[in-house]
Amino acid sequence: MSDLFEDPAPSRNTPEFTVSELSGAVKRVIEGEFGLVRVRGEIGRVSRPASGHLYFDLKDDRAVMAAICWKGQAGRLSVRPEEGMEVVATGRMTTFPGQSKYQIIVEDMAPAGAGALMAMLEKRRAALAAEGLFDAARKRPLPYLPRVIGVVTSPSGAVIRDILHRLRDRFPSHVLIWPVAVQGEKCAPEVAAAIRGFNALPEGGPIPRPDLLIVARGGGSLEDLWGFNEEIVVRAAAESRIPLISAVGHETDTTLIDHAADRRAPTPTAAAEMAVPVRLELLAGLDGQGARLSRCAAETIRRRDQRLRDLARALPRLESLVAGPSQRFDLWSGRLSGALGQSVAARRARLEPLGAHLRPRLLADLVARQKDRLGDRTRSLETCLGRRAERARDRFEALSARLAPAFARLIAETERATRRDAATLGTLAARLDAAPEARLARLSDRLEALDRLRQTLGYRETLKRGYAVVRADGAVVTTKAEAGTAAVLEIEFQDGRLSVGRGKTRKPKEEPPAQGSLL
């Protein structure tokens, strides 16, 4: 009965391990059996604690694997892990004895093909668009003639040369270049820092603050342009207080910075064309406006002169204003004299029969009274006529006083417009005279530079470094065979030429026969 309660004897062929020993053995087997591996899967449950390490899961439809990326390596990953992203992780397998699970230590990570990148790009675009970073209301107009243009691009390569060349051809401007990496892990932080750095420049500081920014890069694959799809770059472009043109890739390439920028250019050259107008077209337009201004000024002066003439003709002459009352005065004066004579004669005829009955004194009194009445009426008539003439004169003077300021203002405005137009035309003429001289000076400098380049690249500079030119019959000899067939060779050195004739060809000395062996 006691055997039922005793432990069976352990098998002699089965080794015994502690938990730690077995976990360590499993760890050594996994790490030794699997070296550097690449695992494809979907990212899930991403965790970023304060330590800076990165913890996440790699899963497919049948299994889940824990993944760790240490702090030092997490900052160098080319792709920022996000939940739901399909990636290919490169790392080494290991185990964590504390939880009895296996895991992969990730050293590098890449999206699993362009489809995964496009899916992640679309997800990021939708999230940023939901925040309003791509709204048309946020976009600002570009300045018409920017004094300073800031360019964020690589300092070497065709992009910056194309931009500078196009700006120089169209309208030379002050250009500030902020050199950045346009590809790789440093691209996004450097581009974002450059945009924010230009915006941080103070107005009126030692370094002029740009009026316009251009972020440019040449064409490339989706992976090459990925730095311009990073959230840090998009937010920097959207927060920029300086108008910004995005010129990343070719016309068919689209990045998220294109949506956040104020304008998108299909190529870096097109960005330079958007930034500034053509100077020669502006000068031609200025000449046209100057001619139009001259014509308008001449037409305005002609119209105002004609208006003055019309107003002068519409005014009545002084003689015509006084002629009517004067004629009526003369008429009534003539009639008054005749009427007085007739009245006196009639009254005399009527009074003569009565005179016999009147006493001289009464008659004298009556005549005196009539004479006084006649004098009063004469004076009253003269006063009335004088008042009418005075009113006519006052009316004429009032009309003249009302028209005089208008005439003076019209003449003063015409003189000011004429002086202003003359000054504008003088300035335009001076600028037009100076433009050909400046262009001629630039062309002369360019011609001198090309001549110096021609002299530097000429073969005579090569002769100074110890080389020589061999000619035969006036043609340059470039091979040994050509030199062997020529009768006379002419060798040109730095300080002159030397002719060399062919001598007799020596017959090669025959080698002595080999000495035989006596043995």
Curated annotation (Swiss-Prot):
Protein name stated in the entry: Exodeoxyribonuclease 7 large subunit
- Tell me the compartments it is located in: Cytoplasm
Q: Which GO terms describe its molecular function?
A: exodeoxyribonuclease VII activity; nucleic acid binding
The record's similarity note reads: Belongs to the XseA family.
Q: Which UniProt keywords apply?
A: Cytoplasm, Exonuclease, Hydrolase, Nuclease
Q: Which organism is it from?
A: Cereibacter sphaeroides (strain KD131 / KCTC 12085)
Give GO cellular component annotations, separated by semicolons.
Answer: cytoplasm; exodeoxyribonuclease VII complex
Name the job this protein performs: Bidirectionally degrades single-stranded DNA into large acid-insoluble oligonucleotides, which are then degraded further into small acid-soluble oligonucleotides.
The record's catalysed reaction(s) read: Exonucleolytic cleavage in either 5'- to 3'- or 3'- to 5'-direction to yield nucleoside 5'-phosphates
Quaternary organization: Heterooligomer composed of large and small subunits.
GO BP terms: namely:
DNA catabolic process
CDD domains, per the entry: ExoVII_LU_OBF
Name the InterPro entries on file.
Exonuc_VII_L (IPR003753), Exonuc_VII_lsu_C (IPR020579), OB-fold_nuc-bd_dom (IPR025824)
The annotated region (Disordered) lies at 500-519
EC assignment: 3.1.11.6
Pfam families, from UniProt? Answer: Exonuc_VII_L, tRNA_anti_2
The domain of life for this entry's organism is Bacteria
Q: Does the keyword Cytoplasm apply?
A: yes
